[in-house]
Amino acid sequence: MIDSNMVAQAVPDRDQELSFLADAAQLALDHARGLGADSCETSASVHFGLNVNVRLGEVETLEHSRDRGLGISIYLGNSKGHATSGDLRPETIRKCVEKALDIARFTQADKCNGLAPVDRLAKHFPDLDLWHPQALDADSTTMRALACEAAGLENAKISNSDGATASSSFGLSVYANSNGFIGRRDGTRFSQSCVLIAGEGESMQRDYWYDSRRAFSDLESVEETGHKAARRTVRRLGARNIATCEVPV
């Protein structure tokens, strides 16, 4: 059994993470303007993920990720420099800004470079209902993937499996520019998939099914995903090539 305490998918504190990203973005903008940038824009993000792949009843991979990143674009007139960093410590952000500025100094001007006009920037941000956090540990995620594959293999015409996957992810990001705009985005995603093989020898066919939702509770059952993958795979059996011909479209 997997030690779920080691790879549990904890729910991030949305407000705390967005505040941290906003501070990082503001630091980048302030440093860029302080160094002489005519205008600048930046995006900071964080992603948390848990992904389990199984095949033929065995766990193949288990991945737990927590990635942060920041990108900064600096404009000197119509010359643009861009740099990114996966480290959001203040000193690293400042170095990233300085690299982008160095690039801008040696980049050919392009009249299409620059920020969007202020009057074209969004001022109202409706709630799109994309944030539905739920804590899932490695054990339960693995069981979902195994159950999904097992359901597909119940079909007697299924001869093999290319595996099943169960995953969950949380993403948060902040975009800001020197025109005073700042926007925040958040979202969750939960998914499951199954890939199966039917037939033998030269008559084998392969197909899949998956389900992906913002809210874990909206997912179809893993058994249904496996059964759909099996039905889609089996219906490919007996397929044959047709002769070249003219047909209505």
Identify the role of each PLM range.
Residues 1-248:
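Active-site bordering "gate/hinge" segments
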